[in-house]
Regions:
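N-terminal cap/lid segment of alpha/beta-hydrolase-fold proteins
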Residues: 3-13, 18-21, 26-29, 55, ...
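Short beta-strand element of the alpha/beta-hydrolase
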Residues: 165-174
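Short amphipathic alpha-helix adjacent to the substrate-entry channel of hydrolases
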Residues: 180-199
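Alpha/beta-hydrolase active-site loop
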Residues: 209-230, 248-251, 397
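Alpha/beta-hydrolase fold nucleophile elbow
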Residues: 231-243
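Hydrolase active-site cap/lid region
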Residues: 250-307
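Short beta-strand/loop motif that positions the catalytic acidic residue
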Residues: 325, 331-333, 337
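C-terminal catalytic histidine-bearing segment of alpha/beta-hydrolase fold enzymes
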Residues: 344, 350, 355-413
Length: 413
């Protein structure tokens, strides 16, 4: 019997664990497994990296007495990771040839990027023994979508046709702008039975080009919109915000009711100065009622000192009225956040929020860029450690369980 690659992937969804088994090898044969893709939208990658960027990883294995290598049971003894880790080849993918892309500002021309195509090869002494291809997906095949265009925000709704009204989640990504990262997170959440609305609050055509004086009323309008959908349970709406999207979400929670629960990933407890390109805008990030929200200006000297001393700001400049927040609140933050001090911010939010249910998931090695399970994270490529990827799985699984428990099973108000 020749070498054969067995792909064991029941759901084929990007955040699900799978196994790859190699059969028909010689007893105790050393092999190299190579995983490749040039059809891959990676939420953790820079915005200008195209989906046809070439990614590759490899690992060395020794077959057992039956001539079998199983990624969930066999330890890698070399390559891009070592030890037993069934998703190690996926997590350790590296961008070998980066292809840059132009920004797409027109929502109707923005692709879903919901399919990822992989190629896997098995070699012994550099001789090819077997190869195969397979796909994984950001959303299930039965999830539909459509676009929304409003005066100052745009969105993409993901939903499964159903006779029952379902809970919904509003999804906001960070300072990169646009909707690409938000939509792929929204797709992942829709697989759990939620209607999801990914929002672009700046950076697309016919809306603000910079993260500067964005109206809080955008989220009020989005909430009212999703509450009126025939297939949505209007009393069970959650919100997910990451980075500046978490700041935007928390500010919304301080001034509006109607959100059943929230997950804030790498949050801030205060409003920071807006951005004009890569420079400070000299204005607030957000407005309310046509007026700028009080904000903390960016000061390079203070930033450097705080980074070196590992301290956070001790003033109250721009701190939100967190005491007004009452919905169940899950915070995900890092003690090594390289962008801002989400750890101290989370502690302050936990102390002040009046939520009847609240929790923090802390990461110690994974920093600010923390999205879904099993994605490679090029921001932390110098850290060759399993813990970064374990913390990504922990964070994402807690995100899913929080929304499921609060929106499907909780009867508290």
């Amino acid at each position: 019997m020749g070498c054969k690659i067995i792909i064991k992937d029941t759901s084929k969804i990007m955040d699900s664990k799978m196994n790859i088994c190699i059969q028909g090898l010689k007893k105790f044969e050393e092999i190299k497994i190579i995983l490749e893709t040039n059809c891959f939208y990676n939420i953790n990658a820079p915005m200008n990296w195209a989906e046809n960027t070439f990614w590759q990883s490899e690992a060395i294995f020794l077959s057992d007495s039956n001539g079998i290598v199983s990624l969930e049971k066999s330890p890698s003894i070399g390559g891009d990771y070592t030890g037993i880790r069934s998703m190690g080849l996926f997590e350790s993918l590296k961008a070998v040839t980066i292809v840059n892309k132009k920004h797409i500002g027109d929502l109707k021309h923005l692709p879903l990027n919901d399919v990822v195509s992989y190629k896997i090869s098995v070699l012994s002494d550099e001789k090819l023994l077997a190869k195969t291809t397979f796909n994984r997906f950001y959303k299930k095949n039965n999830i539909n979508h459509y676009d929304i265009q409003r005066d100052s925000w745009q969105g993409r709704v993901f939903y499964e046709e159903s006779k029952n009204k379902k809970p919904a989640i509003i999804v906001l990504s960070g300072s990169d702008g646009g909707i690409e990262k938000a939509q792929n997170i929204a797709m992942m959440l829709s697989n759990q039975g939620f209607v999801t609305l990914a929002i672009s609050y700046f950076g697309m055509n016919n809306q603000k080009s910079n993260l500067d004086r964005i109206p809080l009323e955008n989220l009020e309008e989005a909430l009212k919109y999703i509450q009126k959908l025939d297939f949505v349970n209007s009393t069970k709406i959650g919100i997910y915000g990451r980075s500046k999207g978490a700041e935007y979400s928390l500010l919304f929670l301080t001034k509006y009711d109607g959100i059943k629960c929230a997950v804030l990933n790498s949050p801030s407890d205060r409003v920071y100065e807006g951005l004009k390109g890569k420079r400070n805008s000299k204005h607030s990030s957000w407005t309310y009622g046509g007026k700028e929200i009080s904000y903390k200006p960016f000061k390079i000297k203070e930033f450097i000192i705080n980074k070196l001393m590992k301290k956070s700001s001790i003033d109250d400049c721009g701190v939100m009225d967190i005491e007004n927040v009452r919905c169940p609140l899950l915070l995900i933050s890092s003690i090594n956040d390289e962008i801002w001090d989400s750890y101290s911010a989370s502690i302050n939010i936990m102390k002040k929020a009046k939520s009847y249910k609240k929790n923090i998931i802390l990461t110690t090695e994974l920093g600010h860029m923390n999205t879904i399970s099993y994605l490679p994270n090029p921001r932390y490529k110098k850290y060759k450690t399993d813990k970064i990827y374990d913390e990504a799985v922990l964070s994402w699984e807690n995100t899913l369980s929080w929304f499921i428990n609060c929106l499907y099973f909780s009867h508290e108000f």
